Amino acid sequence: MAKDKIHPIVVQALENEQWTITNDPLYVEYDTDESAFEIDLGAEKLIAAEKGNQRIAVEIKTFAGSISNQFHSALGQYLDYKAALSNSEDDHDRKLYIALPEEAYNKLNSIRFFRQRIQQYELKFIVVDLESQKIVKWIE
């Protein structure tokens, strides 16, 4: 699977926030190899002791080109990956996020149809400032 152009920037942004990349890509098998997925990143971060370990999986998207086509593709992948993760012995506890540039998130958020789908499917985002290579928002 080809890595998006912003892949190294997202990796750096996560590392800047003390995330340790554990799998790049994260391989999740559902039933067989035919239904296996590669998710761009697996990362885990130790949170305060009372919260335990927080584990995430991150799909990286640039949202270049048609925003409608890119959203449709990202939504389909997100739903498939979420189902695969929930059935995985090793990775069922990972929270799934879509990492995307701040500009792309702002554009999605400005269109009512996309806002409604984001709420409907409870999408989670990591919004990244590409210039500073920093995470500007975690959308839960």
Regions found by a protein language model. Give the residues of each.
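Nucleic-acid nuclease catalytic cores
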Residues: A83-Q119, V128-L130
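Charged phosphate-binding loop/patch that engages nucleotide di/tri-phosphates or the phosphate backbone
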Residues: Q120, K124-E140
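Basic, low-complexity intrinsically disordered segments
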Residues: R55-A57, G65, N109, F113
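Short beta-strand-loop-alpha-helix junction that forms the active-site gateway
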Residues: I60-F71
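Nuclease catalytic cores
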Residues: A2-V11, W19
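Active-site metal-binding core of divalent-cation-utilizing nuclease and nuclease-like domains
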Residues: T20-A57, Q70
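An N-terminal amphipathic alpha-helical segment
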Residues: N69-A83
